[in-house]
Amino acid sequence: MLYRMTDRPAFVLHEHRRPHHHFDLRLEENGVLRSWALPKGLPTDPAENRLAVAVPDHDLEHLTYADADKSIADTGWWEEHDRNERRIVFTLHGSRDPARYALIRTGRDWLLHLMKTRVDDPAWVRNGFRHFRPFLTTDTTAV
């Protein structure tokens, strides 16, 4: 049985070791997990797009599923910012800092693009300061 910790739509990034190493990105939507196979994983540089191959939807139980050949690389929730027939723009909120991506349809397949984070991005404003450490300035001329 699957227990949900939040009302926000969930995501999971599975790492597969067989039959060949790849990742699966799964986004909760309308009671299922929409899924894309990522042969090279999530992009880490906005200048580099990664192939994302749409695969059949999975049951929500896959949010917590792992076995000898499949492990959970990351999990959390996601928020959609924009969508049309050719693209989905969203932020993943997982174990790392939030990251905004665009899934871009290229015909039969998709490209996954890491977007540059903007200071005025509401996700950054809400979550971007979690590693901020305030500091005090001191007068170095005082003895």
Question: Which ranges hold each PLM region?
Answer:
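A charge-rich, low-complexity, intrinsically flexible signal that marks solvent-exposed coils, linkers
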Residues: 1-143
